[in-house]
Amino acid sequence: MEEEVPGFYGESGKSVQATLSSLKMLDVGKWPIFSLCSEEELQLIRQACVFGSAGNEVLYTTVNDEIFVLGTNCSGCLGVGDIQSTIEPRRLDSLTGKKIASLSYGSGPHIVLATTDGEVFTWGHNAYSQLGNGTTNHGLVPCHISTNLSNKQVIEVACGSYHSLVLTSDGEVFAWGYNNSGQVGSGSTANQPIPRRVTGCLQNKVVMNIACGQMCSMAVVDTGEVYVWGYNGNGQLGLGSSGNQPTPCRVAALQGIRVQRVACGYAHTLVLTDEGQIYAWGANSYGQLGTGNKSNQSYPTPVVVEKDRIIEIAACHSAHTSAAKTQGGHVYMWGQCRGQSVILPHHTHFCCTDDVFACFATPAVTWRLLSVEPDDHLTVAESLKREFDNPDTADLKFLVDGKYIYAHKVLLKIRCEHFRSSLEDSEDDIVEMSEFSYPVFRAFLEYLYTDNISLSPEEAVGLLDLATFYSETRLKKLCQQTIKQGICEENAIALLSAAVKYDAQDLEEFCFRFCINHLTVVTQTSGFAEMDHDLLKNFISKASRVGAFKN
C-alpha cells in the first residue's frame, strides 16, 4: 500500500499530491525545459511543476525550501514582479521558506499554491478574477488570499482554465473566478472575484478530493459519491445530458460505486473506485475515454485496462491524454498521444504516469506536482561511494606522498584484478605506493568505489598511465574522454605523445586530427619543438598522407 505525503491525493487538473513510491522514479530530465538548468541546479530540486501553453514555464523548489521559476512568464505567471521571460532560474523571494502542499495552474496561466501551513497564494493571469483577490489585474507577485479563508487550512487546490477551487481540512470547497458555465457553483453565471464556499448539495458533505476540467468542477466526498458542476457540452459531468450545471449535482449513474479519486482532462473525466476500477465520460474525439471508439459519453463508462488493480489515474485540463498505473507497476496511456489518437489503454515502458505527460501529452505539462525528493534509503552504489576514504570502516591504508587513503580490501579485490592477486594472502593493513602521485592514485581508488573519475584533463594523463599499468580497460576509456575535453594547441603534442606511449588509440587519433586542424599554431609550440624524433617522423609521415602539406 502506498503511503501518501501530507494532504489528500487530488488529481485536480494539475493538482499536486505525490506518493512516496513515486518519489523514487520521477525524472525531470524528460521535461525539455529542464535542459536550461545546470547539473548542480537539478541536483537541488525537490519538487517541480511544468506548465504553460507549450510546457514552457516551470516552478520548482529546492532542498533549501527556496522556490525558483523559469520560462516565458506569460501574464506574469512566474511571480517575479515583471513579465520578462527568463532562461535563468529566478528565485521567488517572497515565498522563501514556504513548503508547498499543493499547487495547480490555469490556462492564462494563473497559479494557485497552498503551503503546508494551509495558506493560499495566487499570481499570474487574472482577467476573470481567478486569483481571488477581488480584482481583474494580473498578479505579478504572489498574493496571500485570506478572504473567507482566514480561519481555514487549505490542503488541496485545483485550477480550471480560468477558475480556481480549494479544499480545506474540514472538507469544505471554496471557488472563485470565471463562471460563464456555472463552474464556480454559485447558482449563477456571474464571475466570482473572491473565494466563496460551494454549498448546495455539498452543504453537509465532507469533500476528500477536488478536480477541474477547463470549465467544470468535481468533488469526491467521504461516502464515495461524486458531485459535479459547470460546463457540460461534451457530457463531461456524467449526468446523461449536455446541459450546464450551475450548482453541484450528484452523478447518479455511479450509485453503489464508491469513488476514491477523480481526474479531469480538457473535457473528459476519469474516476477511480475503491475496487481499483476506472470509469470515464465526456469528450472522446481523441479516444481519451479509452473505450475503443471516439464517441462522446455522457454517462460513466468502464475502462478496461487489465486484470490488475488500478492504483492511480492521471489527466490534466490542458490536455486530451489519460494515463493509469496498476498495482503491479504497469503504466498505461490513451487519448491524444503526440498527434495520434489512442482509443484503448496502451501498455508503456514507463514506470510512472508523469512520464506519459512528459513524452506524449500536448502540451507537455505536469498533471501533478512532481516530487524528486531523494529517498532516505541509500542504494548499494551510494553506500559504496559514501564509504570511500572512510577511516572508520576501512581495513586498509595506502600511504602515497606522505598521505593516507583509506580503503576496503574486499571491495578492491572485487573491483580490480591487480588487487585480487596482490591482496590475496596479504595481512598488511598499510601499503606504501610510490609508482603514482597522490592525486592520481586517489582518483583510481575513488573510481573503484564510484565508477567515475574526478581529475583535470592534465591529471588524467597520469591516471591513463595507471590504467594502462593495471590493465583497467574501462578506466582507460574514461581517461581518454576526460583528456579530450582539455586539448588545446599548446598541449596537443604532449597529449598525442601520451596517447602513443600508453597505446590509447582512440585518443591518439583524436589528438592527431586536432593537430592537423590547427597545424600552423601547433607546429610553433614548444611541445612540437621538443617532440621525440621517432614520434615527429611518424607524425610528419601520417600528416603527409592525409594531405596536410598540400599547397
Swiss-Prot record:
Subcellular location: Cytoplasmic vesicle, Secretory vesicle, Acrosome
GO biological process per UniProt: cell population proliferation; digestive tract development; liver development; lymph node development; spleen development
Superkingdom as given in the UniProt entry: Eukaryota
Any Gene Ontology CC annotation: acrosomal vesicle
UniProt key word Glycoprotein: no
Xref: CDD domains: BACK_RCBTB2, BTB_POZ_RCBTB2_CHC1L
Coiled-coil segments on the chain, per record: none
The protein, known as: RCC1 and BTB domain-containing protein 2
Organism: Mus musculus (Mouse)
High-level lineage: Eukaryota, Metazoa, Chordata, Craniata, Vertebrata
GN (gene name): Rcbtb2
